[in-house]
UniProtKB/Swiss-Prot annotation:
Lineage: Eukaryota, Metazoa, Chordata, Craniata, Vertebrata
Species name: Xenopus laevis
Protein role: Histone chaperone that facilitates histone deposition and histone exchange and removal during nucleosome assembly and disassembly. Not critical for histone deposition during nucleosome assembly.
Family annotation (Pfam families): ASF1_hist_chap
Primary gene name: asf1aa
Domain of life: Eukaryota
Keyword annotations from UniProtKB, A to Z: Chaperone, Chromatin regulator, Nucleus, Transcription, Transcription regulation
Protein name per UniProt: Histone chaperone asf1a-A
Gene Ontology MF terms: histone binding
Amino acid sequence: MAKVQVNNVVVLDNPSPFYNPFQFEITFECIEDLSEDLEWKIIYVGSAESEEYDQVLDSVLVGPVPAGRHMFVFQADAPNPGLIPDADAVGVTVVLITCTYRGQEFIRVGYYVNNEYTETELRENPPVKPDFSKLQRNILASNPRVTRFHINWEENTEKLDDSNPHMHPVLSIEARPSASKGWPMSENSLNVMLESHMDCM
């Protein structure tokens, strides 16, 4: 049984300009004291074509963590535009929140992210070189995809085989505020793209 359960994720400052930091309010519960730190990461998927464009925006160690319910705001700077292919700057991508214990990832929460120009003229005639200062980022906070992995939580034991992750489409999620208009891709296309990054790496 997992010793940590993520109860709630609130997407803050959404929608927002591209260069604003990502902010997530995370609530989790430990069923017993943890002797080592939890490592949380925020990962931005720069391109659906290859994981080489993934950017780890930030990582933070939390712990040792006593039993009980805990909440913190995880903030990370916007991705480096220079590492995002021009063809993937505008449109839908993915941001991931992951957590590991003793180097083993046990949960991954993925959100669709839509980057688009707010000005009508730029939407109709987008520049060849993306202007990130004019882009707005909109996280689809109402539709996260959650994958949980089986790991060994105890000391001095071999790592469990986590090659068969359990996908859960629903987590208690809130947004302040959230919006889902203007998404240019079909739901099937979005699911294929997100699930490709929700597999165990």
